Each structure stands twice: as C-alpha cells, then as structure tokens.
Swiss-Prot record:
GO biological process: DNA-templated transcription
Family affiliation: Belongs to the RNA polymerase alpha chain family.
GO molecular function: DNA binding; DNA-directed RNA polymerase activity; protein dimerization activity
Described purpose of this protein according to its UniProt entry: DNA-dependent RNA polymerase catalyzes the transcription of DNA into RNA using the four ribonucleoside triphosphates as substrates.
Keywords: DNA-directed RNA polymerase, Nucleotidyltransferase, Transcription, Transferase
GO cellular component, one term: cytoplasm
Protein name in UniProt: DNA-directed RNA polymerase subunit alpha
Superkingdom of the organism of origin: Bacteria
Organism of provenance: Shigella dysenteriae serotype 1 (strain Sd197)
C-alpha cells in the first residue's frame, strides 16, 4: 500500500443492511487500528443522548386527578397508562409543541390509532397499545401534549418550575426525546493489501421509526464534526470581531427608478428630468416635481404612495449624493 507512514486511512461506507424500517447495520472500513473503538464509542454516545425528537410531556385524563389513581372500566392503572404513552412514537413537522386528543369508548384496546391529530403530526406506530377498556359503558378521554426536545428530561425537573401554573389533573411524564432505542457497535479485523492490523466498524441501531437509521448516523457524525472544529486550530480560540462597514447609503437609494414600477407616463417624466435613481427622486420636493412637464397631481400621488410603501418620501436630504459608483457612470 503506497503512501506516507504518517498518512491516515480514510474509511468508506462499505454497506448498509436495512434489516427493517427501524433496524439497520452500517459497516465502515478500513480504519486505522484503534479508531474503530474511538469512533464507534463517540457515535454511540451521541446517538443515545443528542438526537432530537418528539415525546409526550403532559397528559390530562378526564376524571383523573393524580397518577396514583385508577379509572373505572380501564384495565391498567394510571401509572401504567403514562408508561405506555412514553412509548408513543410521534413525528411532528414545523412545530415545537402540539396537543393531541383521544376519545374512546366500548370494550377493547385503546391504541395510538385512536388519537386525533392534524396534518402536521404523524403517528408512526398506530398499533401501539395505550390501555384496554373492559366494559361496554367504559370510556376514556385525554389530552396529550407532545414537545420537541433532545435527550432525556425527567418530570421531576419540571415539577417545581411549573407548579404555580400547572392545574390539578395535569400529569407530567418523563420525556425521552431520543428516537434511538438501541445502539451497539462491534469492531472487527480488516485488511488492505499487506496490512492486516486495521479495524472494521459495524454499527447496529434500532429507532422508534421517527427517523431513518442511516439519517441518524449522518446527523450524529455531523454533530461530532462540529464539536471537533474548535480543536482544528487552537490558535483561533478567540475569533477577531469583524466590524461590518455600514454602507454610506441605503441600498434601495442606489436602485433605478424603474424598480418602483411606476406607470409609463410617470417613469418617462422622471427620465426626462434626468432622475435615474431612487436617490435622485427622493431629494426632489413636490413643488419641483409638479414643475415637470406632463407630470400632474395624479402622477405625483402615485410616486408618493410608491415611495411610502418602501419607507421613503420626497424632500429627503442626502449628504454626499451621488456616490462615486453612480457619479462615475
């Protein structure tokens, strides 16, 4: 194998084995000896702790005041229902918080498919069981709050901060935002030409279905790369502040009057007076414009309205006008 002894091998993605929609194996090789465990452990920790996702954070169940109670006609107690709701896999588009509702009556299981939601929400596993109703006259109604977050946030950390505004009957749930349910990696031997001391990294992962396993690994690698950027050049710990030069004139003043989309009559009158830029126009007064041949009060009103819509007006004073970029034209 050619190359300097100080050069590192760059791994390539060898294979992605999609066991199911939520289960995949990803293989990368070749890696320098020891890098299999270095990268595998780093990616594993990020995948478990830093993947954003959605989770149930609060629940209100009709007739239930606290989590240590039971509900007539429901097989499970309230704690078990809350535990089942923690396993709800939800994908939310464009929102950080949504409220879902569930209303069910009659004997039978209550599943995620019974939840009512809008088009921004997708229930990934509609067959997920929440509880069982055991009586024909039994019913259950609940409001479920789902939030977007990262990592694991126990309900105990939110109890005191929300105590004053949390009404009786609103039950807090431990929020497990991570869409990754299981992650493991294995390092095997790899060979390139005459070198037999290399690593092969095999990552096996299962998700709750709200994220594709391949996309999850891609995001984790991006997070790791971004966190390591600061170590690339330690001399640049403090970035110099770049002072933005404030332009001498508002860019809109440097645009031609044609950009105002005036009527043909008004535009021709302005060009006849050598008014080519918006900066030229705003310095004129109403009296000056009314002296322009063929420009009447109707055209003047049009010009004033168009300028006002852009935060400008007639009679403005512009120091050092025109700028050199225009004066040289």
């Amino acid at each position: 194998m050619q190359g300097s002894v100080t050069e590192f091998l760059k791994p390539r993605l060898v294979d992605i084995e999609q066991v199911s929609s939520t289960h995949a194996k990803v293989t990368l090789e070749p890696l320098e000896r020891g890098f299999g465990h270095t990268l595998g452990n780093a990616l594993r920790r990020i995948l478990l702790s830093s993947m954003p996702g959605c989770a149930v954070t609060e629940v209100e169940i009709d007739g239930v005041l606290h989590e240590y109670s039971t509900k007539e006609g429901v097989q499970e107690d309230i704690l078990e229902i809350l535990l089942n709701l923690k396993g709800l896999a939800v994908r939310v588009q464009g929102k950080d918080e949504v409220i879902l509702t569930l209303n069910k009556s009659g004997i039978g299981p209550v599943t995620a498919a019974d939840i009512t939601h809008d088009g921004d929400v997708e229930i990934v596993k509609p067959q997920h069981v929440i509880c069982h109703l055991t009586d024909e006259n039994a019913s259950i109604s609940m409001r479920i709050k789902v939030r977007r977050g990262r990592g694991y946030v126990p309900a105990s950390t939110r109890i005191h901060s929300e105590e004053d505004e949390r009404p009786i009957g609103r039950l807090l749930v431990d929020a497990c935002y991570s869409p990754v349910e299981r992650i493991a990696y294995n390092v095997e031997a790899a060979r390139v030409e005459q070198r037999t001391d290399l690593d092969k990294l095999v990552i096996e992962m299962e998700t709750n279905g709200t994220i594709d396993p391949e996309e999850a690994i891609r995001r984790a690698a991006t997070i790791l790369a971004e966190q390591l950027e600061a170590f690339v050049d330690l001399r640049d710990v403090r970035q110099p502040e770049v002072k933005e030069e404030k332009p001498e004139f508002d860019p809109i003043l440097l645009r031609p009057v044609d950009d105002l989309e005036l009527t043909v009559r008004s535009a021709n009158c302005l060009k006849a007076e050598a008014i080519h830029y918006i900066g030229d126009l705003v310095q004129r007064t109403e009296v000056e414009l009314l002296k322009t041949p063929n420009l009447g009060k109707k055209s003047l009103t049009e010009i004033k309205d168009v300028l006002a819509s852009r935060g400008l007006s007639l009679g403005m004073r512009l120091e050092n006008w025109p700028p050199a970029s225009i004066a040289d034209e």
